[in-house]
């Protein structure tokens, strides 16, 4: 079984982004952005898909299944998306199942925009559950890998200076840290903003 990787495109130029993927032998980039577009045109879906294909890397869009900006109203508390609710969606569960199937066949990197894994739903939402069926590693901008366990340690330290709480287990503290970070980074709908542009689910499999 291959590990699962994640990467944030950040403000990289495409050659640097490609070099990071090649450094870690990535065969498939799985885009988990709800809106697969960027102010950096080489990271918008049409250009990105073509450039990756030209360099022997496949592009798969799973923003509908695993994205953090949802159309389903039941995923919101007020105007804020709730990660716990998103995780219960059948469509989200389907996305996780596709990842599980995919990593048996290829080296996959989940891609979103944010540089730091802890600033992105790819870590705080998707990998919180993907870690149950795969080892997870986050590709940083300098090319170094961070295990998901180390990312969780950073997350825990952000909210719990004393990791040796006598009254709560590490799991309880970690679950609270996930929830708090999710609330901080979750998508908040704006009244004047229309629904996110969506792609139909892809019928192809990994």
How would you name each of these model-derived features?
Residues 1-206:
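Residues lining hydrophobic/aromatic ligand-binding pockets adjacent to catalytic sites
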């Amino acid at each position: 079984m291959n590990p699962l990787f994640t990467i944030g495109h950040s403000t990289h130029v495409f050659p640097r982004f490609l070099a990071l993927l090649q450094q870690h032998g990535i065969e498939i980039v799985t885009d988990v952005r709800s809106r697969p577009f960027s102010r950096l045109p080489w990271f918008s879906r049409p250009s990105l898909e073509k450039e990756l294909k030209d360099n022997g890397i496949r592009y798969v869009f799973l923003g509908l299944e695993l994205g953090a900006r949802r159309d389903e109203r039941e995923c919101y508390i007020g105007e804020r998306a709730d990660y716990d609710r998103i995780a219960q969606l059948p469509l989200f569960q389907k996305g996780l199942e596709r990842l599980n199937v995919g990593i048996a066949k290829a080296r996959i990197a989940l891609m979103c925009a944010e540089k730091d894994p802890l600033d992105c739903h790819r870590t705080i939402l998707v990998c919180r559950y993907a870690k149950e069926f795969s080892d997870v590693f986050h590709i940083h901008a300098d090319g170094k890998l961070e295990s998901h366990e180390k990312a969780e340690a950073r997350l825990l330290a952000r909210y719990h200076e004393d990791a040796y709480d006598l009254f709560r287990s590490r799991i309880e503290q970690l679950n609270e840290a996930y929830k708090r970070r999710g609330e901080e980074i979750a998508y908040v709908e704006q009244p004047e903003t229309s629904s996110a542009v969506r792609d139909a689910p892809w019928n192809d499999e990994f």
